[in-house]
Every structure is written in structure tokens, then in C-alpha cells.
Regions:
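A short alpha-helical cap/connector motif
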Residues: 1-89, 93-118, 122-204
Length: 204
């Protein structure tokens, strides 16, 4: 499946709506123009890049911040200055530490009903050491697999106890309560954020 097909599958519901996109990795600005055309005139686009050159792509509805996506203080300053994002796209440095650090911090600030999409996850399998910069050697693909287990955290504890407790008191992880769906594609992983309710089974 081509990247554009994946974009449309995950983003079509946001077209022509008042939304904010946060894209990590501006490069030569091509994707910024693409998002303007795809989402329509109501979209606000926020770009993050480590290269000062990218500032030249700012326009009326496009703002660029220069900094390191794995720097929490930098990300915090960006978030304080923008509307809460509905879509976050990580097409940045592609190292495991950058992808995991950005995801862990930014996902919490994503609007409910929003989508977090990480591109070029094939770097998890690359031989180059520059992509494998974590002491624990964890790649983003492996981390996403862990999160797929977290998605089912409801079933790790006594199910009868879960069904008797309010969702906000259930002893399950943040990810179980806030990831509705994880979609694995060729070199892309997408997460949909929703407030999850306690799962139940109907016996017929």
C-alpha cells in the first residue's frame, strides 16, 4: 500500500475541518504544501525540524519551530504555543530514541479522536547504528508491539473485578485507556486516540 493510500485511510475524516496538524520533519517543505491542499483552508499546520533552513516555509497558516524532537523542554514550549493537535506525524530523525521519546510525550497532548502516525519505521530494522541509539536497544516497532499488549491490558487482571469498576478506577495502563487502535503498515504505524470504555462480552 502506498503512503498516500495510508494517509487517506487515516486522515480523510479530518478534511475541510478546523484541525491542527503537528508534523515532525519538514525537510524541503513538500509535505506542508501537500497537507494544505489535502485538508483545505481551515487547517493549521505546525512543523518541527532541527534545521534552521526550514523556517523559510512559514506562511499564514504554517508555523515552523526549530529544535530537537527528543528534547522534552523544546516540545513543551511548542505545545504551549499552539492549539492541541488533532494529527501528529513523525517523519523526523527516525532514530529509535527520537521516535519513542516524541511518542511518549506528545501522545498525551493529542486530541481525543486524533491520530498519531509514525513514518519510515523500517529504520527499526536498519543496520546503521545511528537509528539504534537507546541503551535498552528498543526499536519503535518493538515498542509498538509492546503497546499492542498494553491495548489489551484489561485482560491481564481479574476480568470480573474490571467489570464492576468505573473505567477511571480500573487498574490498567494509560495506553489501555487511551489507545483505541494500532494499525501496522509497511513502514508506517498509526495510533488512534480515544477514551476507551471497559470491554464486555455478550453471551448468546
Amino acid at each position: 500500500m502506498h503512503y498516500f493510500d495510508i494517509y487517506d485511510e487515516n486522515f480523510s475524516k479530518y478534511r475541510n475541518k478546523n484541525i491542527t496538524i503537528l508534523e515532525i520533519g519538514v525537510f524541503k517543505g513538500g509535505s506542508l504544501s501537500m497537507w494544505q491542499k489535502y485538508f483545505g483552508p481551515k487547517v493549521k499546520i505546525i512543523g518541527i525540524d532541527i534545521n534552521e533552513y526550514c523556517k523559510r516555509f512559514e506562511q499564514e497558516n504554517i508555523k515552523i519551530y526549530i529544535g530537537d524532537q527528543s528534547n522534552i523542554n523544546f516540545l513543551d514550549n511548542v505545545l504551549a504555543d499552539i492549539d492541541k493537535p488533532d494529527i501528529i506525524i513523525d517523519d523526523g530523525g527516525h532514530s529509535s530514541n527520537q521516535q519513542i521519546t516524541s511518542f511518549n510525550y506528545l501522545y498525551e497532548h493529542l486530541n481525543y479522536g486524533g491520530t498519531y502516525l509514525v513514518e519510515d519505521t523500517h529504520t527499526s530494522y536498519a543496520s546503521s547504528k545511528k537509528f539504534h541509539d537507546r541503551l535498552d536497544k528498543l526499536t519503535f516497532v518493538e515498542y509498538a508491539k509492546v503497546l499492542s499488549d498494553e491495548l489489551n491490558d484489561w485482560y491481564r487482571i481479574n476480568s470480573y473485578k474490571i467489570y464492576r469498576e468505573p473505567v477511571n478506577k480500573a487498574n490498567v495502563s494509560y495506553w489501555a485507556k487511551n489507545i483505541y487502535k494500532i494499525s501496522f503498515y509497511n513502514s508506517i504505524i498509526a495510533f488512534e486516540k480515544r477514551k476507551n470504555t471497559i470491554p464486555f462480552a455478550t453471551i448468546s
